[in-house]
Amino acid sequence: MTAAGELRPVDGLALSPEHRAALRPGEAVTDEQGAVHRLPRFFFQVPSWQEAHALRVASHFALSELITVDSREERLLLRTFPHHVPCAILALARYLEDFRRAADAPVFVSANGGYRSPSHRINQGRVSLHSWGTAADIYRVGDTYLNDEKSIARYGEIAAALGADVRVRAYKEGDDHLQVDLGYLTVVPRECSES
């Protein structure tokens, strides 16, 4: 598996009960503003970590770069394969590739800074766009670490200029990354049915 076209989509509702409990496919959740959103229902199945490293989801990004998590991830999802990644991860990869081109430098996403499940303990019961696979925490661009207001603002302007569908979180005291997101985007693969 080396190209995004080789990813196998699966309906999250057809996964094991344990996986459904951790991923909560299609479940309605309420964000901090009171808006209701549905968690992703359709996922790409990733057979192994080696395949995640080999799979190019964009010219300069391997899938593994967008799904690296730490021990706060749900144990089942962290330690067993296959992994399941929301299909919208491909839209995020395409956006990050455009950002890399605009910044004219390699882009680095932090651990827990790409996709993480709704069960990840860093979420602390909150709704996180990371659970849709549509948010990225960028900690470095080229040789520049994004750990101060000036560097985050500089690359935030570049990120925001790429389109109205992108939201760039404003700098807050103590930030050590630039957060970008594409919203609550869900993808239904052509070969999948919502019925």
Predicted regions and their residues:
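N-terminal secretory targeting signals
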Residues: 1-46, 195
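Basic/polar, cationic surfaces and motifs that engage anionic cell-wall
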Residues: 45-46, 50-69, 175-195
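Catalytic cores and adjacent binding grooves of peptidoglycan-active enzymes
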Residues: 4-13, 127-195
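N-terminal start-of-chain detector that recognizes signal peptides
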Residues: 81-84, 107-113, 150-155
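Surface-exposed loop/turn and secondary-structure junction residues enriched for glycine/proline
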Residues: 69-72, 118, 123, 130
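General structural signal for secondary-structure boundaries
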Residues: 56-63, 83-85, 89, 117, ...
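Extended, low-complexity, intrinsically disordered C-terminal regulatory tails
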Residues: 91-124
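Active-site acidic/histidine clusters and adjacent loop/turn architecture
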Residues: 48-103
